[in-house]
């Protein structure tokens, strides 16, 4: 046997052993024997670099190469599921499906694992891409990190799998691994992860795949997409995928009646506490893919599936004290410090009290025995007090009057529950929070910078506002702790590249209260430059589509602050884009002038957002709901039956994708 043949043999053997150990939980060899085979493979691969294979089992150990993730557009959007919380809502879902299909159907019941969603693409039996959910339209390419997860096959075995397909699932951190990781972080005085989902998500986004490999992530796969799938049944496809090497939950059940669905839910509402990974509900899916296609989608979720969320678990523990946190907007949030208590698989020591009204309503006293609940199984909150357990009444909890970080007097705006620190220019958490928002992906998208780096730069006195970022030089940061030459250069490069971010995102990045992405786009489209916006009157602002007086007043207040104007001036000097691009109107027409158009369904040639732009480009107006004033509906595949019914009732014209494209030619 040649060394090349031995490499191929070892790869095949190690793939099989990985599957037996991590998926079947039935190892055939000891860990020592596995490691010996792996070392032999690594030695041979080092001798024969020309025989490198990205899907070799040796690639699972990870690499310490630091690279930025690229964004990948999903071939099929990763939509979220509609949530339900009661048997009544489950019954309503079941009845809707029954009415729409008017034929027999089965419901596939699956555990709703609480991790981070992933989409895996396989071509010719090999893993070629792993992408996070992201915003549902596009996500991060984390293929290198996913290859370190032993329960995900790099190369499929068996036969019958399509030439190309996607399989989706959940990346998880088992409870035992989560507890071990937090113990290690506590020993190193590092911040603890709040729950396994955050730990799994954070791990998957690490730039160092060697660390990812050490975190022992797991994965369950739950949905196949693509052409030429083996079966019409979703459940049956999962069974086939299991034969190809995927880890499929053996808890999934196919139900023929609503009562069977409820029996499944009730059983796992109790037994889920004994599972090795976090779950927060049950997913119900119509089993037939043909029936799924017939039912279609809403704008946000499929009509053929829902998520039933378990009721939050409660525990009783003692309130020791109340501390306060300040967010980037200056909102002050009270936090209850508790005796440690086990709740939904994690140790809870702190819980949110939300605002002063909640504290007053609970009539809280230090030393009270309080009921703690995890909303959605994740965020702990106090929901009640056991007043019968009061033997000695401690001090009544009263909301603070001054900022715990900078000492400024707190204010409460009319109609709001929260108290605010208005010292936004000198309050450390607000400063750091604003900078973190500024550098985020949807804003300036500055690679290499994150909350830890922002905190480090702030502590070193290098930055005090967002404009300070543009004065940084490589020499300023290269000698900082955990900062090398390459990292420093990447950060400066990322800051420089952010100068090309369009005006609408710069406006969003400033963090003006109530000015989110959508508002920023509308404002930028109306005012074209930061100067024009700064000079706008209240009347000018409220005439912008969807901008009410509250948002307008917030914008005026922002520009009335000399410190904010100074920051904008320094951003201008740095070269940040404070004007909108000259809009190319050469292709604008009035072919759709005066027409109100509703978009519905899934399209082949353009995305929904692209069609919205085309409608506006040709003089039309996008509207969200059908009425007698609707000119026509641009309908793609899987148009919702309720919209179709309403359109027919009102006599609204249905226009296909091809017909629409001909209209604007």
UniProtKB/Swiss-Prot annotation:
<feature type="binding site">
    <location>
        <position position="133"/>
    </location>
    <ligand>
        <name>NAD(+)</name>
    </ligand>
</feature>
<feature type="binding site">
    <location>
        <position position="421"/>
    </location>
    <ligand>
        <name>Zn(2+)</name>
    </ligand>
</feature>
<dbReference type="InterPro" id="IPR012340">
    <property type="entry name" value="NA-bd_OB-fold"/>
</dbReference>
<dbReference type="GO" id="GO:0005829">
    <property type="term" value="C:cytosol"/>
</dbReference>
<dbReference type="Pfam" id="PF03119">
    <property type="entry name" value="DNA_ligase_ZBD"/>
</dbReference>
<keyword id="KW-0862">Zinc</keyword>
<dbReference type="Pfam" id="PF12826">
    <property type="entry name" value="HHH_2"/>
</dbReference>
<feature type="binding site">
    <location>
        <position position="427"/>
    </location>
    <ligand>
        <name>Zn(2+)</name>
    </ligand>
</feature>
<dbReference type="InterPro" id="IPR010994">
    <property type="entry name" value="RuvA_2-like"/>
</dbReference>
<dbReference type="GO" id="GO:0003911">
    <property type="term" value="F:DNA ligase (NAD+) activity"/>
</dbReference>
<dbReference type="InterPro" id="IPR041663">
    <property type="entry name" value="DisA/LigA_HHH"/>
</dbReference>
<feature type="binding site">
    <location>
        <begin position="31"/>
        <end position="35"/>
    </location>
    <ligand>
        <name>NAD(+)</name>
    </ligand>
</feature>
<keyword id="KW-0235">DNA replication</keyword>
<dbReference type="GO" id="GO:0006281">
    <property type="term" value="P:DNA repair"/>
</dbReference>
<dbReference type="Pfam" id="PF22745">
    <property type="entry name" value="Nlig-Ia"/>
</dbReference>
<dbReference type="Pfam" id="PF03120">
    <property type="entry name" value="DNA_ligase_OB"/>
</dbReference>
<dbReference type="Pfam" id="PF14520">
    <property type="entry name" value="HHH_5"/>
</dbReference>
<dbReference type="InterPro" id="IPR013839">
    <property type="entry name" value="DNAligase_adenylation"/>
</dbReference>
<dbReference type="GO" id="GO:0006260">
    <property type="term" value="P:DNA replication"/>
</dbReference>
<keyword id="KW-0436">Ligase</keyword>
<dbReference type="GO" id="GO:0046872">
    <property type="term" value="F:metal ion binding"/>
</dbReference>
<dbReference type="InterPro" id="IPR033136">
    <property type="entry name" value="DNA_ligase_CS"/>
</dbReference>
<feature type="binding site">
    <location>
        <position position="309"/>
    </location>
    <ligand>
        <name>NAD(+)</name>
    </ligand>
</feature>
<comment type="function">
    <text>DNA ligase that catalyzes the formation of phosphodiester linkages between 5'-phosphoryl and 3'-hydroxyl groups in double-stranded DNA using NAD as a coenzyme and as the energy source for the reaction. It is essential for DNA replication and repair of damaged DNA.</text>
</comment>
<dbReference type="GO" id="GO:0003677">
    <property type="term" value="F:DNA binding"/>
</dbReference>
<dbReference type="Pfam" id="PF01653">
    <property type="entry name" value="DNA_ligase_aden"/>
</dbReference>
<dbReference type="InterPro" id="IPR001357">
    <property type="entry name" value="BRCT_dom"/>
</dbReference>
<feature type="binding site">
    <location>
        <position position="110"/>
    </location>
    <ligand>
        <name>NAD(+)</name>
    </ligand>
</feature>
<dbReference type="InterPro" id="IPR004149">
    <property type="entry name" value="Znf_DNAligase_C4"/>
</dbReference>
<protein>
    <recommendedName>
        <fullName>DNA ligase</fullName>
        <ecNumber>6.5.1.2</ecNumber>
    </recommendedName>
</protein>
<dbReference type="Pfam" id="PF00533">
    <property type="entry name" value="BRCT"/>
</dbReference>
<keyword id="KW-0460">Magnesium</keyword>
<feature type="domain" description="BRCT">
    <location>
        <begin position="587"/>
        <end position="665"/>
    </location>
</feature>
<feature type="binding site">
    <location>
        <position position="170"/>
    </location>
    <ligand>
        <name>NAD(+)</name>
    </ligand>
</feature>
<comment type="similarity">
    <text>Belongs to the NAD-dependent DNA ligase family. LigA subfamily.</text>
</comment>
<dbReference type="InterPro" id="IPR013840">
    <property type="entry name" value="DNAligase_N"/>
</dbReference>
<dbReference type="InterPro" id="IPR001679">
    <property type="entry name" value="DNA_ligase"/>
</dbReference>
<feature type="binding site">
    <location>
        <position position="406"/>
    </location>
    <ligand>
        <name>Zn(2+)</name>
    </ligand>
</feature>
<keyword id="KW-0520">NAD</keyword>
<keyword id="KW-0479">Metal-binding</keyword>
<dbReference type="InterPro" id="IPR004150">
    <property type="entry name" value="NAD_DNA_ligase_OB"/>
</dbReference>
<keyword id="KW-0464">Manganese</keyword>
